[in-house]
């Protein structure tokens, strides 16, 4: 739909401007929905340099450098984003945006950004996520 395409383009530009990042470095915006009990296990958004995934996913756009995530709704219970090494739980609130650097400025992975999506225990959780890469195809 042309309206959805324009919305995606507008969001891409706004997020890029907010983070002071070139919009062309970003992957497509993705939406996620978590039903009660659904979760996403602990992970990093970067690809480990020694993994098979690194060659597959980083060869053409480089490593994931930044993550931007925005919560779209309140969750009655649960649904926090938990950063294990920071001992930080972030409760979903509509419009709350969080972002983090997946790499240090010298290029090494930032292990402190390991995070997980805890399951909503009452209600659903909706988020939008955008990842930024080291370089662009354009």
Listing of model-derived features with the role each one plays in the protein:
Residues 1-99, 103-138:
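Fe(II)/2-oxoglutarate oxygenase catalytic core
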């Amino acid at each position: 739909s042309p309206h959805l395409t324009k919305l995606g383009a507008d969001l891409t530009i706004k997020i890029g401007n907010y983070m002071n990042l070139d919009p062309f470095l970003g992957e497509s915006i993705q939406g996620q929905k978590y039903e009660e009990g659904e979760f996403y296990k602990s992970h990093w958004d970067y690809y480990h340099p020694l993994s098979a995934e690194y060659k597959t996913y980083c060869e053409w756009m480089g490593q994931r450098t930044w993550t931007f995530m925005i919560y779209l709704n309140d969750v009655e219970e649960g649904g926090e984003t938990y950063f294990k090494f920071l001992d930080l739980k972030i409760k979903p609130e509509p419009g709350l945006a969080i972002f983090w650097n997946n790499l240090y400025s010298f290029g090494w992975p930032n292990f402190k950004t390991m995070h997980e999506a805890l399951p909503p225990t009452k209600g659903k959780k909706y988020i939008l996520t955008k990842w930024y890469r080291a370089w662009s195809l354009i």
